[in-house]
Amino acid sequence: MSAEPSSSAQASAPTVVSVAPSKNGRTPGKAHKSAKTALRRSYISPSVKTPFEKRMEKEKAQQAAKQLEKELKEEKENERQRKVNIIKERRARKEEKQREEELRAKMSAKKLQRMKKREGRSKKING
């Protein structure tokens, strides 16, 4: 250590650096932070960038097309279900008719048998 500390202090006097006020006026420890701004993506070409309104119009058109497609699909499915129901009803009627026909045939066979039996009795008696 030398005997002239005051002269060296003057030569290397601390320089005062003004501290920039940070966000919300909080300076301690934040002087090195710069104010941040919203990100602007400059790497997207202008031909790709579209205004919000145009994008919304396009989205509405797509939604309308989807809605129309959905309605057409529902209509087609309803028509298919109607045809399936008609076929099922037709088959059920046919089966019911067949069952009634078999029942009639069975009943008429029994009736014929009874009539033959009566006829046979009368022949024996009359015969």
From Swiss-Prot:
Pfam families reported in the protein's UniProt record: Cgr1 (PF03879)
Ranges of compositional bias, category Basic and acidic residues: 51-105
Region (Disordered): 1-127
Start-end of Low complexity biased regions: 1-22
Keywords: Coiled coil, Nucleus, Ribosome biogenesis, rRNA processing
Gene Ontology biological-process entries: rRNA processing
InterPro entries: Cgr1-like
Coiled coil region boundaries: 52-114
Subcellular location: Nucleus, Nucleolus
Main location: nucleus
Protein name in the entry: rRNA-processing protein CGR1
Gene name per UniProt: CGR1
